[in-house]
């Protein structure tokens, strides 16, 4: 096995030293000597870390600090750069002096690097290149070092944790809202309108005359109970039954002045929901006087869907609807579907039978009807029942 002999005299440059390439740029250094005299020497080489010059005989001392100017000739213009440097090594015999820069600014470092890089690549350094280098920002700002967690106070830790928790909660809420909107968009069908419906009955005027209501303040009437009285002239009652001899002016006037009174009775145990003709007003024969609602009638829900949802509103489909004043939604099933007025239209009318009985007093109340055909526990049960499991 061959073993290499270690040479202890080899000096390895550091990373910082390897970054400073020494080049021979034509330039001069001008500074004040120990006796305040002006010293100007030609540069031997220069790098981004320092420079050297030879004066023949020592003009300064090792370790001394000086301020001066680096002078370069670019095109027909001179470039002077203020620098501070320290003498690091000095050869008494040849007068060669090596200096290190101190406190160089960003502009000076950028200019030196531009000149050194252009020289190494064989390019000519022009005034325009130097000006362009000085105009742009060649350095990035240092990253702000955050303080270590143990060095923070309890209040700062609590504030940081609270802020992170608040951001997390807001993000979680936004994510949940987006998921809900997507679910409603693809798995939920909303009815355009809906209301509680109860089959009603109408009481019409048997003869032409005036009407007077007999219904109490609560609007409740029993089957066969009088709900209104009416007055009609005898002439109206006998119209069509008198001969031409009986229709003389004297007889007509006599019959017209005579009034006949009658009553209207309730056909069921009902509640009066509307009175179409006010008390004392004249009503023609066949005109609707009262609209009655049977108290024992089962209330249903009528809803209107778009024709586009035709496949989703089939009879037997389970729906959910909400009634004003109730906290929990109710459930029901579609009993029948039909187009409006039994003709072609842009919407479908559906009749919904609630699973739990609805109070008939809710007749006419608006409801919100929703069909949820997305994955859920009930959806899994329905699928299992359909499959015969």
From Swiss-Prot:
Annotated metabolic or biological route of this protein: Glycan biosynthesis; alginate biosynthesis
Coiled-coil regions, chain positions: none
Principal location: periplasm
Function (record text): Required for alginate biosynthesis.
Domain PilZ: 17-117
Lineage top rank: taxon: Bacteria
Recorded name of the encoding gene: alg44
Family matches, as SUPFAM superfamilies: PilZ domain-like
Keyword S-adenosyl-L-methionine on entry: no
Family, as annotated: Belongs to the Alg44 family.
Plastid in keyword set: no
Gene3D superfamilies in the record: predicted glycosyltransferase like domains
Transmembrane portions of the chain: none
InterPro entries linked to this entry: MFP, PilZ_domain
Keywords for the protein's UniProt record, in alphabetical order: Alginate biosynthesis, Periplasm
GO biological process: alginic acid biosynthetic process
GO molecular function, one term: cyclic-di-GMP binding
Name of protein: Alginate biosynthesis protein Alg44
Localization in the cell: Periplasm
GO cellular component: periplasmic space
């Amino acid at each position: 096995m061959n073993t290499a002999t270690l040479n202890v005299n080899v000096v390895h440059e550091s990373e910082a030293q390897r970054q400073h390439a020494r080049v021979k740029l034509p330039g001069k250094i001008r500074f004040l000597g120990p006796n305040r005299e002006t010293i100007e020497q030609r540069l031997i080489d220069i790098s981004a870390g320092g420079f050297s010059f030879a004066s023949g005989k020592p003009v300064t001392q090792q370790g001394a600090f000086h301020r001066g100017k680096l002078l370069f000739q670019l095109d027909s213009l001179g470039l002077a750069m203020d620098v501070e440097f320290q003498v690091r090594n000095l050869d008494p015999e040849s007068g060669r002096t090596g200096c290190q820069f101190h406190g160089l600014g960003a502009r000076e470092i950028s200019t030196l690097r531009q000149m050194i890089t252009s020289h190494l690549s064989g390019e000519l350094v022009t005034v325009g290149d130097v000006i362009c280098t000085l105009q742009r920002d060649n350095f990035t700002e240092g990253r702000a070092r955050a303080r270590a967690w143990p060095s923070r106070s309890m209040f700062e830790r609590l504030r940081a944790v609270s802020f992170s928790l608040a951001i997390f909660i807001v993000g979680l809420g936004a994510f949940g809202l987006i998921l809900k909107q997507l679910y409603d968009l693809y798995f939920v069908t909303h009815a355009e309108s809906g209301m509680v419906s109860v089959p009603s009955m109408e009481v019409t005027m048997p003869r032409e005359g005036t009407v007077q209501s007999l219904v109490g303040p609560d609007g409740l009437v029993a089957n066969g109970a009088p709900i209104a009285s009416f007055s009609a002239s005898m002439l109206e009652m006998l119209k069509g039954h008198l001969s031409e001899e009986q229709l003389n002016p004297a007889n007509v006037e006599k019959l017209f002045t005579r009034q006949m009174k009658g009553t209207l009775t309730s056909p069921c145990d009902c509640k009066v929901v509307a009175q179409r003709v006010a008390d004392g007003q004249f009503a023609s024969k066949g005109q609707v006087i009262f609209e009655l609602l049977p108290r024992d009638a089962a209330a249903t829900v009528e809803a209107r869907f778009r024709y586009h949802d035709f496949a989703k509103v089939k009879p037997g489909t389970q729906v959910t609807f909400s009634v004003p004043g109730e906290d929990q939604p109710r459930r029901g099933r579609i009993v029948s579907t039909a187009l409006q007025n039994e003709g072609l239209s842009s919407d479908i009318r559906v009749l919904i039978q609630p699973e739990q009985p609805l109070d008939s007093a809710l007749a006419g109340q608006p409801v919100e009807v929703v069909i949820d055909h997305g994955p859920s526990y009930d959806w899994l049960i329905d699928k299992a029942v359909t499959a015969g499991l």
